[in-house]
Amino acid sequence: MVPLVEIKDIHKSFGDLEVLKGVNFSVNEGEVVCLVGRSGSGKSTLLRCINLLEKPDAGTIRVFGEDILHTRDVNAYRAKVGMCFQQFNLFNNMNVLRNCVYPQQKVLKKSREEAEKTAYQYLDHVGMREFAGQSVKTISGGQKQRVAIARALCMNPRLMLFDEPTSALDPEMVGEVLNVMRDLAKEGLTMIIVTHEMGFAREVADRVVFMDQGKIEEEGTPEQIFEHPKSERTASFLRASVNK
């Protein structure tokens, strides 16, 4: 099986700070991979490299069989890769429905009628259809993140990237977003998720990847990582996470 995502020897620095130090990993179609690790370990930078929001200094990234670092059409590539950020990145001057419709019209060249039909379908999927006419300024953080997920799904992505999607939410709103992501995992959507939600990673991930100091320290099934970590750094991180 050819991996959907294949990353080889990725390096990335910001000035004198080397953030990624030769990262290698792959993701198969339909797989859910959770990236975990301390803040500053390189998780989010790796995710941003996959979506070409950052360009690596060295190495190769192949997604859908394509060398994306030399793609001629970044927008066409990004249309196939959904991404949800910590801070939602919604259009605050638009209502909920328009947030989901506009990208379809702009990138996929859909008619308004077709785009609205798709938007309602995915807003319904994340439990936000009744808020379609509301300004995004008036809804909660958890609701904003669900709209952001719906917006990404409207583009019919083959791959979804989540960069700590619950970190900016109040604790009582975390569950509603994780429930949507659980449903997506059950539907077989390929997902790479940067998360500090260890219980969620343990429950949903097919594979957990622990990053430390810009490298992959250890990876395995949730049972292998959480029950039988081989690395002392992994074990130390997990102990600290449980004791928070």
Go through the PLM ranges and name each one.
Residues 36-38:
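The feature captures the beta-strand-to-loop junction immediately N-terminal to the Walker
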Residues 51:
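Helix-to-loop junction immediately C-terminal to a conserved catalytic motif
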Residues 59-69:
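Conserved ABC transporter NBD signature motif
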Residues 68-82, 112-113, 225-229:
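ABC ATPase NBD coupling module
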Residues 101, 112-131, 179:
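Conserved ABC ATPase "signature" region
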Residues 135-139, 143:
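Conserved ABC ATPase signature
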